[in-house]
């Protein structure tokens, strides 16, 4: 179940190679991930999930920094019957409890990298709330959105049928490579100011009209559950 980590490390290796050759990107790129050699599995519908001995809040504290202006979260998202596509799928942008529209340029870049039409997937309110609140989440791909005010987009590595990501033989190297290439392309354009994860004016208008949704980034009125 290490597709996301492998993609992140691959993107880091590519950026280091580019830098060594004098091809430096404008802006800073922060790449963070975690690798656990003995992660447990836990029951989840429709297939078992890979769990972690470290809580999501702890991982967010180490992986999501205040200096980040935007976050691209890469994660295996195969254990569901919602996404019926093999390859990569892009989430809508999530910011401070709001699910915003899919960023046009992010979608165009994904089409360029994969050579296929853009595939996106539905994000529920539950999916953008913190783990530990007792509700169903499709997976942890958008958990970084609970730890930052910056816009977050999930890049899901997906399958055409429900596949346990923790199963052996379930990783597809070409999809991981495409995810890494996409991350590099996003970093190039975002750092150069040629790409936005969201429309800031539109977001400000939503908040002015309907109010803050930042309470969805918290446990709300009840204590955390196991």
Indicate residue ranges for each PLM-predicted region.
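Active-site-adjacent substrate-binding region
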Residues: 70, 76-223
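Acidic, glycine-rich active-site loops and adjacent beta-strand->loop/helix elements
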Residues: 29, 33-40, 78
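Short, electropositive alpha-helical surface patch
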Residues: 35-51, 140
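A glycine-rich helix N-cap at a beta->alpha junction
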Residues: 47-72
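Flexible, glycine/proline-enriched loop segments at strand-loop-helix junctions
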Residues: 2, 47-48, 56-58, 89-100
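Solvent-exposed alpha-helices and their adjacent loops that cap or buttress functional pockets
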Residues: 21-25, 62-66, 144-149
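Alpha-helical metal-binding/catalytic segments enriched in His/Glu/Asp
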Residues: 1-34
């Amino acid at each position: 179940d290490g597709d996301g980590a492998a993609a992140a490390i691959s993107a880091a290796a590519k950026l280091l190679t580019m830098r060594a050759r004098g091809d430096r990107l404008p802006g800073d790129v922060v790449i963070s991930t975690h690798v656990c050699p003995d992660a447990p599995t836990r029951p989840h519908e429709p297939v078992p999930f890979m769990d972690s001995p470290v809580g999501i809040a702890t991982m967010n504290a180490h992986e999501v920094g205040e200096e980040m202006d935007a976050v691209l979260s890469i994660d295996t998202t195969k254990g569901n019957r919602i996404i019926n596509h093999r390859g990569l799928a892009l989430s809508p942008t999530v910011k401070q409890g709001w699910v915003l529209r899919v960023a046009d340029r992010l979608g165009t870049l994904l089409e360029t990298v994969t050579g296929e039409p853009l595939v996106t997937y539905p994000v529920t309110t539950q999916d953008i709330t913190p783990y530990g609140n007792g509700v169903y989440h499709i997976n942890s791909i958008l958990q970084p959105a609970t730890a930052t005010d910056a816009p977050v987009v999930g890049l899901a590595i997906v399958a055409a049928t429900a596949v346990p990501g923790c199963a052996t033989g379930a990783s597809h190297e070409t999809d991981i490579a495409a995810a890494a290439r996409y991350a590099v392309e996003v970093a190039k354009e975002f750092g150069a100011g040629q790409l936005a994860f969201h429309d800031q004016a539109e977001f400000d208008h939503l908040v002015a009209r309907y109010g803050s949704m930042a309470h969805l980034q918290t446990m709300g009125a009840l204590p955390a559950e196991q």
